[in-house]
């Protein structure tokens, strides 16, 4: 990955980390499955009317919508509504990174290099430190739900990688057409018409929940997912996916500042390990490229010097012959 792509991946991590606070605020008013449906419905309508369809196979577009859209956010929102804290949700969802590396190895035959494997191991150790400190305070069901959402994200990553869209932005926008109807149907079955009607009727007065929904739609979905899809289109899935582990650092920090979910020293230590695990492979590749460039320069200088000597000797010989 280039330095620019690394910075973009880091920016997406910050946007998505803060998004967990926005989701927490929105869930105080909207039922989880209805909220997930509204998230994509707001984008699906203008997409159908104004955005040209991307040139990709339909199965990969639908697969991306099911994995990244339906599975990830249905389970994530249900888990947070069941009591999963915003900061801890941002942490557990990052299991999508090792899930993606595993799925890419099985289905795409992508073999991650040793630096990537070491980086994933270090980042996972950071996740384990934070989860070990905070996990005892959370019941099993919310954790399992958010982990299921992480698997959905990984499935979406693989479908996006296979699609290879000509326009990642159009691909991401058309993905939003897939989730609204299935999520709304699930909301009708699970949450019931009465709860949906009440939430929509009182929506104009729920300004905080609406601001959170707007953040989720504009920044987290359009900006964040658009950049993420672009990165997956021009880099291997195993290179991009580990950057999702930076999300809990931003998630824990924003939850601390806004929701007063104060991280402990162990959580901060785990965050440092996550950052090191994500950036380690990139730093290793940079060092290797610098070493290779230096070695090439050292090898080239004697050759250039030898060529100069030969040129001088040839000139002297021609002078003597004259």
What is each PLM-predicted segment?
Residues 26, 35, 79, 106-108, ...:
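Hydrophobic/aromatic residues within transmembrane alpha-helices
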Residues 58-67, 112-123, 142-143, 166-176, ...:
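Cytoplasmic-side transmembrane-helix entry/capping segments in multi-pass membrane proteins
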Residues 1-5, 29-33, 37, 54-58, ...:
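Juxtamembrane helix-entry segments on the extracytoplasmic side of multipass membrane proteins
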Residues 10-18, 22, 62-82, 103, ...:
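Hydrophobic alpha-helical transmembrane segments of multi-pass membrane transport proteins
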Residues 43-47, 100-101, 137-199, 203, ...:
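Transmembrane alpha-helical segments that form core, pore/gating elements
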Residues 282-297:
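Membrane-interface capping segments at transmembrane-helix boundaries
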Residues 17, 37, 41-45, 124, ...:
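Small-residue-rich packing faces within the transmembrane alpha-helices of Major Facilitator Superfamily
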Residues 41, 47, 103, 112-132, ...:
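Hydrophobic transmembrane alpha-helices of multi-pass small-molecule transport proteins
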